[in-house]
């Protein structure tokens, strides 16, 4: 059986950029390179879908999920905060069956894999661009995040026992 992860919507849920020590920080930056700490968190929630909400016709049955990719970046120069950037970027996804009987028969683990690995991989390029634009617009060099391997991040969290609770569809990497 084949399944498809379909993007229904994507949006900024929360975006914050703080530049608390300007303009002095720009003088400090000319003399020292900032230390940047980045954390990435992925979470998902199931969205209720009523039978009436399903389109009539031949569309396969689907489940809707909101996946949140949260990235926090903090830059410091000599223990002075240069900037703090926090973003929660979300996508609404459906999981559809490509079969004629429209039946979704995925294990809980397979659904988590789609939501916590495949979905954030789709969202990440948009988050990366938004952070680069925000830092650049604030007078700093654009912060270009390294590509995140969500598969490895998820597998490492499983090995550590994080996110094992059935109600906890999250992966956190600090």
UniProtKB/Swiss-Prot annotation:
Protein localization: Cytoplasm
GO molecular function: unfolded protein binding
InterPro entries cross-referenced by the UniProt entry: SecB, SecB-like_sf
Chief place of localization: cytoplasm
Keywords annotated in UniProt: Chaperone, Cytoplasm, Protein transport, Translocation, Transport
Tagged with keyword DNA damage: no
Pfam hit, one: SecB
Keyword Nucleus listed: no
GO CC annotations on file: cytoplasm
GO biological process: protein folding; protein tetramerization; protein transport
Function: One of the proteins required for the normal export of preproteins out of the cell cytoplasm. It is a molecular chaperone that binds to a subset of precursor proteins, maintaining them in a translocation-competent state. It also specifically binds to its receptor SecA.
Record's subunit section: Homotetramer, a dimer of dimers. One homotetramer interacts with 1 SecA dimer.
UniProt similarity note: Belongs to the SecB family.
Protein known as: Protein-export protein SecB
Designated gene of the protein: secB
């Amino acid at each position: 059986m084949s399944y498809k992860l379909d993007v229904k919507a994507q949006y900024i849920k929360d975006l914050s950029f703080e530049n608390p020590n300007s303009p002095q920080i720009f003088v400090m930056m000319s003399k020292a390179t900032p230390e940047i700490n980045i954390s990435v968190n992925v979470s998902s929630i199931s969205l209720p879908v009523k039978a009436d909400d399903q389109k009539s016709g031949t569309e396969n049955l689907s489940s809707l999920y909101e996946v949140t990719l949260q990235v926090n970046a903090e830059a410091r120069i000599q223990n002075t905060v240069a900037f703090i950037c926090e973003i929660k970027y979300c996508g609404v996804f459906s999981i559809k069956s490509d079969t004629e009987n429209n039946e979704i028969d995925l294990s809980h683990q397979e659904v988590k894999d789609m939501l916590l690995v495949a979905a954030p991989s789709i969202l990440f390029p948009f988050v990366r661009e938004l952070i680069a634009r925000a830092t650049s617009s604030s007078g700093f060099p654009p912060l270009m995040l390294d590509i995140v391997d969500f598969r490895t991040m998820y597998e490492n969290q499983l090995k550590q026992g994080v996110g094992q609770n059935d109600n906890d569809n999250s992966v956190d990497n600090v």
